[in-house]
């Protein structure tokens, strides 16, 4: 029987890329499965890039215009996605038109963590919904636990606990979780209500595909398998590695990679902060002082902070000579490079990279682990404060730049991290025989095994396909 799944990712490029990677793996594992990815497009550039990534004729794309301008707040984005339900409904109806020859059997929707309103459309078609959770299982566990406490009326007003030493027992962690490490989105009653509503919808699904590895987050996956939560499928690490060994047309990127090839193994610290990471002039100066004093070789992907990262991405500095400490380029000319945008995966793959200073986004974290590069985490927004705690305190797979950083770029909060704090983190990160480096190498091997035949990712994907097929058979007997 030919079956069809409909994937609905959020418009964020990192979510789109992870969705495409998982969809490709699923269709490769079952010849009777087809997938249509419905892309909510605000950018023709992102859309054309995504649709060019696959040549499989059982993986198709349906583009839905999100309008002329992307909403500039997450809550507005949620409302906007809800308004697109009629367009999604029409697209799916055409897809499974029973009057067409060889029309597939619609088996379900796989919705992004920020597209849960599309569960309503799946219900209209009488098919199950599954959640694709692009972040880590630990944070998913925290979110579900907070929702449980909220509904039981057993939750604090967390906005008052920012400077307290209160710790929360989170079932997806083995260590008590300090509320100082709680992302700021939970410390606003309005935002808390939004995410609690999302978590309730997570529980309505038939299963949750999580971008993680059992050997990486055993405690979190144990919690998610307790029977009160939809089945979790650890399908990670989902990584887009197609650009690792490609020849770059871009001259600057080629020069960067050649420079790395000339450096000793594990000698370069790489600083890169994702698609939304940018810094003020004052913070740039502090970081430059740290790199100067550390004495390490470095590759620094540096961009200017955006006043609203949902409205416009970080930009490039045009006056670095004026911003950086006097003589910085002269003193570091033989051991460092300051660049703009960077091809992160291709750089992490280079043997010269010995450490990665990162915002701790989950995609970046998995890429770093894949290549066996230890991280120093500097969380900037969203769930990254939790990621930092899990990676540093819970798992021993990273070092910290600043404990309990009080900034959040999404909410317009900032706090300067001093040169001394950054330098200390870099020196700790670049220790060649550290326990963190040894642990990262061990987990890196396990991440590679996860993607091999019979590994945890393949097992989870096959189990998911089996469950989807069985759910169809069950629904047919019920009807």
From Swiss-Prot:
The keyword Transferase applies. GO terms for molecular function: UDP-glucosyltransferase activity; UDP-glycosyltransferase activity. Its EC number is 2.4.1.-. Transmembrane segments: none annotated. Pfam families: UDPGT. Keywords: Glycosyltransferase, Transferase. Optimum pH is 6.5-7.0. PROSITE patterns: UDPGT (PS00375). It is an enzyme of class 2 (transferase). The keyword Transferase applies. One of its GO terms (biological process) is response to salt stress. UDP-alpha-D-glucose binds at residues 275, 342-344, 359-367, 381-384. Belongs to the UDP-glycosyltransferase family. Glucosyltransferase that glucosylates the (+) enantiomer of abscisic acid ((+)-ABA). Is not active on structural analogs with alterations to the 8'- and 9'- methyl groups. This is UDP-glycosyltransferase 71B6.
């Amino acid at each position: 029987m030919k079956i069809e799944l409909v994937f609905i990712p959020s418009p964020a490029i990192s979510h789109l890329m992870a969705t495409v990677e998982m969809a490709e793996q699923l269709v490769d594992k079952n010849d009777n499965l087809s997938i249509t990815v419905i892309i909510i497009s605000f950018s023709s550039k992102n859309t054309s890039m995504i649709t060019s990534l696959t040549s499989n004729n059982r993986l198709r794309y349906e583009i839905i215009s999100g309008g002329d301008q992307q909403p500039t707040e997450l809550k507005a984005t949620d409302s906007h996605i809800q308004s697109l339900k009629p367009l999604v409904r029409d697209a799916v109806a055409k897809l499974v038109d029973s009057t067409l020859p060889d029309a597939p059997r619609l088996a379900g929707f796989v919705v992004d963590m920020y597209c849960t309103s599309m569960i309503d459309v799946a219900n209209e078609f009488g098919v199950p919904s599954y959640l694709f959770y692009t972040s880590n299982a630990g944070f998913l566990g925290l979110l579900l636990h907070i929702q449980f406490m909220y509904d039981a009326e057993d939750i604090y007003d967390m906005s008052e606990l920012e400077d307290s030493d209160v710790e929360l027992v989170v079932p997806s962690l083995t260590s008590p979780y300090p509320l100082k490490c709680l992302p700021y989105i939970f410390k606003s009653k309005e935002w808390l209500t939004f995410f609690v509503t999302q978590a309730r919808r997570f529980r309505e699904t038939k299963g949750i595909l999580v971008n993680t590895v059992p050997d990486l987050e055993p405690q979190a996956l144990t919690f998610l398998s307790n029977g009160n939560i939809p089945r979790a499928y650890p399908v990670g690490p989902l990584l887009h590695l197609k650009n690792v060994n490609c020849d770059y047309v871009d001259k600057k990127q080629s020069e960067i990679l050649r420079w790395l090839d000339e450096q000793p193994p594990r000698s370069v610290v790489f600083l890169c902060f994702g698609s939304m990471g940018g810094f003020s002039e004052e913070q740039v100066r502090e970081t430059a002082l740290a790199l100067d004093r550390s004495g390490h070789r470095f590759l620094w992907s540096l961009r200017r902070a955006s006043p609203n990262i949902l409205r416009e991405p970080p930009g490039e500095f045009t006056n670095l000579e004026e911003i950086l400490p006097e003589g910085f380029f002269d003193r570091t000319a033989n051991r460092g490079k300051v660049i703009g945008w960077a091809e992160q995966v291709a750089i992490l793959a280079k043997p010269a990279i010995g450490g990665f200073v990162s915002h701790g986004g989950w995609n970046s974290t998995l890429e770093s682990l894949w290549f066996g590069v230890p991280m120093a985490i500097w969380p900037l927004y969203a769930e990254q404060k939790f990621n930092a705690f899990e990676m540093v305190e819970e798992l021993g797979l990273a070092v910290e730049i600043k404990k309990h950083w009080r900034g959040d770029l999404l909410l317009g909060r900032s706090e300067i991290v001093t040169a001394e704090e950054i330098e200390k983190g870099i020196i700790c990160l670049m220790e060649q025989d550290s326990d963190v480096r040894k642990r990262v190498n061990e987990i890196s091997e396990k991440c590679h095994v996860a993607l091999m035949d019979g590994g945890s990712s393949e097992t989870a994907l096959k189990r998911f396909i089996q469950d989807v097929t069985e759910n169809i058979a069950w629904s047919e007997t019920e009807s």
